[in-house]
Swiss-Prot record:
Pfam families: NUDIX. Keywords: Early protein, Eukaryotic host gene expression shutoff by virus, Host endoplasmic reticulum, Host gene expression shutoff by virus, Host-virus interaction, Hydrolase, Late protein, Magnesium, Manganese, Metal-binding, Multifunctional enzyme, RNA-binding. Its main location: host cell. It comes from African swine fever virus (isolate Tick/South Africa/Pretoriuskop Pr4/1996). It is found in: Host rough endoplasmic reticulum. This is mRNA-decapping protein g5R.
């Protein structure tokens, strides 16, 4: 049996501003439209021969609505929930055939529904720093800038990269190691107005994002307590760096 550890790397940009109304540093966070567990299941990133506890844990980490969607056994609806109208027909066909082989052909989905019924609690939709996977031959910083614009609509001329800051964090989930690398940027004054409504201006730019907003450190701590991904160890040092940067700048 293949036990090799997989490494998945994402690169992100922590972009900050000083909110002049309350004199607090804020950063842009985006909320995913679906849970990581739901995405992993739909893309068949699991072993059908794994112990049932691993599969039940995957369903535990889905939202209630996602579990209900899987129980319909309607793969088209599940796929649409992630990809919407994105044309990825070859990938769809490959994943559908695997879903059909794993769950529909053996017993018409009875085992799958039984496993879902054993799930307890409910997962949450993650708030995270805008990030994504690097393209082939793409530098880390270029990837961070590209992904940030794709997820927020804010282009390169509106912020300044602070090259002295670069942090990474890793965590493990079964056979997969997830590594996130982050750069830091400071927003230019032309976009620092506290009333700038990112939720309305950039919402639904891409299929995977449902919300986008400015968050201060108190909000980051609150969010981190309610989800599996703890943002405080990365955003905390970034905010401290920004404080020192602003102190010496002025």
């Amino acid at each position: 049996m293949d036990t090799a550890m997989q490494l998945k790397t994402s690169i992100g940009l922590i972009t900050c501003r000083m909110n002049t109304q309350n004199n607090q540093i804020e950063t842009i966070l985006v909320q995913k439209r679906y849970s990581l567990a739901f995405s992993e299941f739909i893309h068949c990133h699991y072993s059908i021969n794994a112990n049932q506890g691993h599969l039940i844990k995957m369903f535990n980490n889905m939202t209630i609505n996602e579990r209900l969607l899987v129980k319909t056994l309607d793969f088209d609806r599940m796929w649409y929930h992630i990809w919407i109208e994105t044309p990825v027909y070859e990938l769809y066909h490959k994943k559908y055939q695997k879903f059909r082989k794993n769950w529909l052909l053996p017993d018409n989905g009875k085992k799958l529904i039984s496993l879902i019924n054993q799930a307890k609690g409910s997962g949450t939709l993650l708030w995270e720093i805008p990030k994504g996977k690097p393209k082939e031959d793409e530098s880390d910083l270029t990837c961070a800038i590209r992904e940030f614009e794709e997820e927020t609509g804010i282009t390169r001329e509106y912020y300044q990269i602070l090259p002295e800051f670069k942090k990474s964090m890793s965590y493990f989930d079964g056979k997969t190691e997830y590594k996130h690398i982050y750069f830091l940027a400071m927003l230019c004054k032309s976009l620092e107005e506290p009333n700038m409504n990112l939720s309305l201006q950039y919402e639904n730019r891409i299929a995977e994002i449902s919300k986008i907003s400015w968050q201060n450190m108190e909000a980051v701590r609150f969010i981190s307590k309610r989800q599996s991904l703890n943002l405080e160890p990365i955003i905390g040092p970034a905010f401290n760096f920004i404080k020192n940067y602003l102190r010496y700048k002025h």
